């Protein structure tokens, strides 16, 4: 292979480093990089995306979007109008809490401290608690059907991919059972 299909770069790094932007432009021009995807992981980068949409030079953005974290919808719509790709991360709310905890916790009563108590990462995640809480905590159980104690993960994936402006949802699994549950929406 003579080219990278997708080069993922953190938005803040891309915007703050002119030499990086120039080098990526050169590599794209030379055919060494086919597509640039800006990662919108941090809150400031997410807000810029929600407010303005994609950067003109980017071919796609990787953004946080799920059933309980919908703040990216304006940016996603703007990206679609501009013909840009939209890749979704954290479709299942990230790895900070188990799916069981996401479904069984009463998030109307819970606080950020509840998230720290439930997460196996505990205090080590305090520095990014605002961000993690925004995409982990919320009414996941609303995705359950009558008689289900826990919403199937496929329901969360289905909710994300039903947005016609979403190009792709990145979903992580660790077992055949998790894979089958996530794919149940197809």
Residue ranges and their predicted role:
Residues 1-2:
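Phosphate/pyrophosphate-binding loops at sites that engage ATP/ADP/AMP, CoA/4′-phosphopantetheine
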Residues 9-186:
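Beta/alpha (TIM)-barrel catalytic core signal, keyed to glycine-rich beta->alpha loops juxtaposed to Asp/Glu
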